[in-house]
Amino acid sequence: MSNITIYHNPHCGTSRNTLEMIRNSGIEPTVILYLETPPSRDELLKLIADMGISVRALLRKNVEPYEELGLAEDKFTDDQLIDFMLQHPILINRPIVVTPLGTKLCRPSEVVLDILPDAQKAAFTKEDGEKVVDDSGKRLK
């Protein structure tokens, strides 16, 4: 069992790139397909606290439930926002990665490099062609 967990959406390029950077460090993480298996309320609250971000900062804005529920309005409490995320997991921004070095919302995907315990084993180029790690495993940006 890995000591690294990624809350992953395989339909998201940022999430796929993040997962591949974890694997490029020689680690096979625990992959939680959070749209199929959403975190519990307690798990979600812990992730938010561990990331040191606000509940609203974890909200995904470019999805239907955000518009339909009127979440752009600043009238909802954190508890209400959590309820919406639990009812509509697509509202949870991703990928979230948990390692022994910290928990981060990995947007952009190379943020994961800040919390991986092991160095990159090889060059890494994101799906869009952007080179992030050179041939020696050194971060480029």
Swiss-Prot record:
Which reactions is this enzyme annotated as catalysing? [glutaredoxin]-dithiol + arsenate + glutathione + H(+) = glutathionyl-S-S-[glutaredoxin] + arsenite + H2O
Q: Which family does it belong to?
A: Belongs to the ArsC family.
Q: Which UniProt keywords apply?
A: Arsenical resistance, Oxidoreductase, Plasmid
What species does this protein belong to?
Escherichia coli
Annotated active site residues, numbered on this chain, are: 12
GO BP term (any one): response to arsenic-containing substance
Q: Which GO terms describe its molecular function?
A: arsenate reductase (glutaredoxin) activity
- One short Pfam name that applies is ArsC
Protein name (Swiss-Prot/TrEMBL): Arsenate reductase
Q: What does this protein do?
A: Involved in resistance to arsenate. Catalyzes the reduction of arsenate [As(V)] to arsenite [As(III)].
> What's the EC number here?
1.20.4.1
Site features described as Important for activity, chain residue numbers: 8, 60, 94, 107
